[in-house]
Amino acid sequence: MQKLKSIYITKVCPILVNEFLYTNFFEIPKINKVVISRGFGESCNSSKILESLLVELKNISGQKPILCKSKNSISNFKVKKGMPIGMFVTLHGDKMYSFLDRLINLSFPRMRDFNGLNIKGFDGFGNYNVGLSEQSIFPEIEYSSILKNKGMNITIVTTAKTDLESFSLLKGLGFPFCV
């Protein structure tokens, strides 16, 4: 069993039950999925950079990313129909817990000038978004192999109904929030 999943079952669930007075086991919030997405910007013209960004996200997540292509042309942005403009990966189950464990314990401490996660990342429905400015904080990425420094967005989707429930869940799992 994943370390983070066992922490959730043994420590976080009892705390949430006492804090929010849940009567049913299925009311306790849990993490449904983690979505890692990144846009290409101007680097979508170079196939070499595009391939390196795909390999980086595959190494970070352990899963092949899905390319997002433009639905129509926008001449102001030099985007043609069918051109790749981004990619995303959706993680569930053990891969999700493994990624979150590496994110909390390895990646966040490697960030420069990191004072904790911002509480404003909650969306009002119990989900949390965090934006990363560079991919070099992940131990799977070698700094010498980075062709273009691009960030990514990580969305943590929970079953929590409110931001307070989601905050308690993520704080119990070890997310370093700045309060």
Curated annotation (Swiss-Prot):
One GO BP: translation
Entry annotated with the keyword Ribonucleoprotein: yes
GO molecular function terms listed in the Swiss-Prot or TrEMBL record: rRNA binding; structural constituent of ribosome
SUPFAM superfamilies from the UniProt entry: RL5-like (SSF55282)
Tagged with keyword Plastid: yes
Pfam families (alphabetical): Ribosomal_L5, Ribosomal_L5_C
PROSITE patterns: RIBOSOMAL_L5
Stored InterPro entries: Ribosomal_uL5 (IPR002132), Ribosomal_uL5_bac-type (IPR020930), Ribosomal_uL5_C (IPR031309), Ribosomal_uL5_CS (IPR020929), Ribosomal_uL5_dom_sf (IPR022803), Ribosomal_uL5_N (IPR031310)
Keywords: Plastid, Ribonucleoprotein, Ribosomal protein, RNA-binding, rRNA-binding
Family: Belongs to the universal ribosomal protein uL5 family.
Subunit structure: Part of the 50S ribosomal subunit; contacts the 5S rRNA.
Family annotation (NCBIfam families): PRK00010.1 (NF000585)
Alphabetical list of PANTHER family matching this protein: 60S RIBOSOMAL PROTEIN L11-RELATED (PTHR11994)
Protein name per Swiss-Prot or TrEMBL: Large ribosomal subunit protein uL5c
Origin species: Euglena longa
Gene name of the record: rpl5
